[in-house]
């Protein structure tokens, strides 16, 4: 993935939901994708050309191999499209099953043609054998999680970096103790009081926490902070002298960014909570990055610097430097090296 400029970075924070567009750069920047697809195309051409010649000169050519060859090219086109739209991670389970079917087709065709006489049949069998080898490599890659050692090693050569692992993030989220507010409703007048009155729940059942931790700040929480105004007190309704409830209520549909101040947001980053919970991962800076002077939320770092990071689901990660400075960093400038290792 190309390094975003300032305008693109701001757009990413304003619109955190990914927009999948057709880009050949998504394919050509991934050496594994471009090399495996190229080899698969060469093998398919050999198998198809050999099959055409063999079928025209021999009645012993297995007829079911034609569907296997057509199925293989359709699958290759699908892989190409998914890579170009950057949707490969969403369809890995489907691809694993589809490749298993293709592997059965190509191996059966190879078994039928390998022992037939003639160079034409031999060329066709060589093509389907190569396709079988590529299919089993794809099954191993697409069937493994992105956090597996083999996939991390393969993705380390990609210009886009190591792909996000849903399994690894789920495990990290499940290890965070959820916060349950004491004597404060979700319509509390003061959101800050919810944070200070919250205590970790003694037991959390299920794979995900029952409630989101207040220490976890997603990339969507940064929307609108670039032009944040000075802190303003919430408007009070009614007469202060009366005993009526004069609190400002916030409903579930409130964005929360309209009255969130820059100081409150940075306070979430510098919260005195458990560091290992807020920043469970360790990342190494691949390049030197200088924060934008107009963006109070970006943090600078040097090449080779070790950073603690959290919220690794987006393009911008929450990070903490060794000197205690916290902020957000571009994910394509760093590489995950472990969890709680420094």
Swiss-Prot record:
It is found in: Cell membrane. Residues 1-31, 84-93, 143-342 are cytoplasmic. The chain crosses the membrane at residues 32-52, 63-83, 94-114, 122-142. Residues 278-339 form the SH3 domain. The keyword Transmembrane applies. PANTHER family: FCH AND DOUBLE SH3 DOMAINS PROTEIN, HIGH OSMOLARITY SIGNALING PROTEIN SHO1. Plasma membrane osmosensor that activates the high osmolarity glycerol (HOG) MAPK signaling pathway in response to high osmolarity. Belongs to the SHO1 family. This is High osmolarity signaling protein SHO1. It comes from Lachancea thermotolerans (strain ATCC 56472 / CBS 6340 / NRRL Y-8284) (Yeast).
């Amino acid at each position: 993935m190309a390094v975003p400029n300032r305008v693109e970075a701001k757009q990413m924070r304003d619109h955190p939901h990914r927009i999948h567009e057709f880009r050949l750069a998504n394919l050509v920047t991934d050496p594994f994708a471009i090399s495996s697809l190229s080899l698969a195309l060469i093998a398919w051409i050999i198998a198809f050309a050999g099959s055409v010649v063999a079928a025209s000169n021999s009645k012993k050519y297995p007829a079911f191999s034609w569907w296997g060859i057509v199925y293989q090219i359709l699958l290759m086109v699908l892989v190409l499209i998914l890579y170009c739209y950057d949707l490969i991670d969403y369809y890995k389970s489907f691809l694993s099953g589809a490749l298993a079917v293709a592997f059965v087709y190509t191996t059966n065709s190879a078994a039928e043609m390998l022992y037939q006489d003639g160079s034409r049949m031999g060329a066709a069998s060589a093509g389907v054998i190569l396709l079988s080898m590529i299919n089993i490599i794809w099954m191993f890659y697409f069937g493994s999680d992105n956090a597996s050692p083999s996939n991390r090693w393969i993705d380390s050569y990609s210009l886009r970096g190591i792909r996000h692992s849903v399994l690894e993030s789920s495990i990290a989220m499940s290890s965070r103790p959820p916060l349950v507010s004491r004597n404060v409703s979700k319509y509390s007048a003061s959101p800050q009081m919810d944070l200070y009155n919250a205590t970790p729940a003694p037991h959390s059942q299920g794979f995900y926490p029952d409630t989101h931790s207040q220490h976890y700040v997603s990339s969507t929480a940064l929307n609108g902070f670039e032009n944040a105004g000075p802190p303003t007190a919430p408007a009070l309704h009614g007469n202060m002298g009366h005993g009526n409830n004069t609190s400002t209520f916030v409903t579930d549909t409130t964005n929360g960014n309209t009255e969130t101040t820059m100081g409150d947001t940075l306070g979430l980053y510098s919260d005195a909570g458990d560091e290992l919970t807020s920043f469970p991962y360790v990342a190494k800076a691949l390049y030197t990055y200088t924060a934008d002077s107009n963006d109070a939320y970006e943090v600078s770092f040097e090449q080779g610097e070790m950073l603690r990071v959290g919220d690794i689901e987006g393009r911008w990660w929450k990070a903490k430097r060794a000197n205690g400075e916290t902020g957000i960093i571009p994910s394509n400038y760093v590489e995950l090296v472990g969890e709680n290792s420094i």
